C-alpha cells in the first residue's frame, strides 16, 4: 500500500491508495498481479480517533467508486462514525481498468480467461486483502449498492468473521435464480416502465416511432463515428428505473429533430448516455454475475423473444429495453468489437464457481440491514424477498418511496435509517 499526498475536501481528509493483489486468487503464487485504487475518507476533526472502517462497494458491474465533491449524502452520514474506503473494484476506475487496448496482446481465449477473474468472488478476496492492511485487528462494515450488495453477500459467504455490519441498498441478490429467470422478471419490470413512461408523455411515442424509422432508413453516425441503430436507441431506456429518468428521457426525445434532420445535440447526448464504450466490463460481465455452475448462453437475448412488444419493427410502437446485454453490442460498440470473440467464449463458459454459500448465509450472525425497493427495475423485488428468507440476522426496509438510485438521491437519510435498523434504535 502506498500513501500519496492527501488533500482536504469540505472538511474531509481524502487520501488515495494503491494496492497490489493477485490476478487469480486461486493461484496466489502466480506472478501476475493487478493494481487496485481506493480513496480513504475521514472527517478532518476525527483523524486521531479510533474509528471503525466502512467499505463502500459500488454498483455495476463495471463502474468505479464515487468521486466525492462535497461532504453530503450517505458519505456525510457515514463519516459521523466511520472511516470510509471508496474502492474501485478490479477492472474499473483506476484499478487496472479493462479496455480493448489492455487486452490487445492476448488471443480471444486468453482474453476470456483474464476476464473470468473479475467477478464478485475475486472482488471480495481483493477487499479482504485490503482489510488485512487497513484494519488487521478488527472487522469492518460494508455498504453495498446494487451489484455492490451482491458482492456483500459474497463477502458474508466467504469471510463472515471479517464483517461487523452490512448495509444493502437495492442490492439483495437473486440467489438460486438462473440468468434466464432474472431477465424474465426484469423484462416484465421494463415493460411496466415503458407503459408508465408513454402514459405520462403520450407525445413521446410518436417521436420514438419516428426516430426508429429514421434510424432504420438512414446511416446515422454518433460524434465518435459509431453508427446509431434502432437497438441502441432502445437501450436509452437503461435508466428508466432511476428517479428523474422519465423527464430526462422525454427531454432527449423532445429535442431529437430539427425539421427533418436529427439535432446534433441529440447525437452528442445519446453518445454520452451510452456506458458501454467507457465501461466495457459492464457489458462483458453483466450476465456472468448470475452464473454459478452454468453458462449464460446470452440469456437476455434468448428471453427477449418472450416479450414481443420489446422487438421493434416498422409499423409497431417503439419500446425501450433496460439493463440487458445483447451479442449484437459486440458488433456495434467501438470499444466492444475487439472483445467480441472473448465475450462469446464467456457466454458459453459453464464451469463458473459458486458466488454464495446458502448454508453460511442461513447461519449468518452479522447484522444486515437492507433497503429493498418495491418497484426496482434492476433487482427483482420478489427474488430479493426469497433471498432474505434464507439470510439470518437480516432486516429489510421495504419501500416504494425510492427508485433503484435512492442512495444517490437521499443517501444521508437512507443510510441513517439502515444504521438504526441494524442497531434497534
Curated annotation (Swiss-Prot):
GO terms for cellular component: cytoplasm. Residues 52-315 form the AB hydrolase-1 domain. One of its GO terms (biological process) is proteolysis. SUPFAM superfamilies: alpha/beta-Hydrolases. Its EC number is 3.4.11.5. Keywords: Aminopeptidase, Cytoplasm, Hydrolase, Protease. InterPro entries: AB_hydrolase_1, AB_hydrolase_fold, Peptidase_S33, Serine_prot/Carboxylest_S33. Signal peptide: none annotated. GO terms for molecular function: aminopeptidase activity. It is found in: Cytoplasm. It is an enzyme of class 3 (hydrolase). It catalyses: Release of N-terminal proline from a peptide. Pfam families: Abhydrolase_1. Higher activity toward long peptides. Acts on hydroxyproline beta-naphthylamide with almost as high an activity as on proline beta-naphthylamide. Belongs to the peptidase S33 family. Homotetramer. This is Proline iminopeptidase. It comes from Aeromonas sobria. The lineage of its organism: Bacteria, Pseudomonadati, Pseudomonadota, Gammaproteobacteria, Aeromonadales.
